[in-house]
């Protein structure tokens, strides 16, 4: 069966000038996939050029656009023909296996939750994305959907993250850690300590507390935290990476000797840049819904948005929603009863 991805082509800082070329490039790399390109047809069709007749592409007109600064509540209530809403509706109707948007994060969360609904046993959706580590990458959630969480929410995040990694990376027992201010069990606030007890009592491969530096050491396949902590950690890391890159460029441009050193080290520098290029990790999945909804960075370029499409495709191909649903049904009652 062909996997079909619906794309909100009007969302993001760059809109169709990025989303349409990224879609074309994705199809070149995934010849068996199909795409539904959602947006203003008069804008999208010229950008497709000869690809407008590609049988793997279906154009679906949507007259409205959700602004990047628009109120999520107003977007949900008033813009029922937005490209974001129509793309999500495709998943709900079974006409697409996943959707991708670079649009307003709050609106995507609100509309996805309203249209797709939550999986039984899951109280809240969580934003999950991969982060680079010294030996590969880790998955971290929540990255901003839920500022305040109870222990049972963090347990649910752990289950969802573990099932995502198990499905997409084919790991039987992915390791799960909880982000904390120390490795000892006595460390942390009451919510984190209670959540650790729930995770420890579950049948997840829980390794205990992970400190902030452990994120990038690759100490766990999945790292659980509330959305406030996760978002701060993510944005701090992005800012640090930008500062280091800027400082490195400045140092190599300082004089003729440092410029020569840069030329000698250029292959090493390019490999380093590629390894930690945030565009490679673009595409955060909203876990916990009865369908796959993927959030791309609003500022994504063609490479980054293409990776978000690929992430949605891989999640659909590996039946992530079904894996989470079956594991939640089996684990949640037992996990809670054992504490």
Curated annotation (Swiss-Prot):
EC number: 2.3.1.274
InterPro entries, A to Z: FA_synthesis, Phospholipid_synth_PlsX-like
GO cellular component: cytoplasm
Top-level taxonomic group: Bacteria
Localization (cell): Cytoplasm
Pathway involvement of the protein, from the record: Lipid metabolism; phospholipid metabolism
Record key words, sorted: Cytoplasm, Lipid biosynthesis, Lipid metabolism, Phospholipid biosynthesis, Phospholipid metabolism, Transferase
Pfam families per UniProt: FA_synthesis
Known role: Catalyzes the reversible formation of acyl-phosphate (acyl-PO(4)) from acyl-[acyl-carrier-protein] (acyl-ACP). This enzyme utilizes acyl-ACP as fatty acyl donor, but not acyl-CoA.
Known partners and oligomeric status: Homodimer. Probably interacts with PlsY.
Protein name (database record): Phosphate acyltransferase
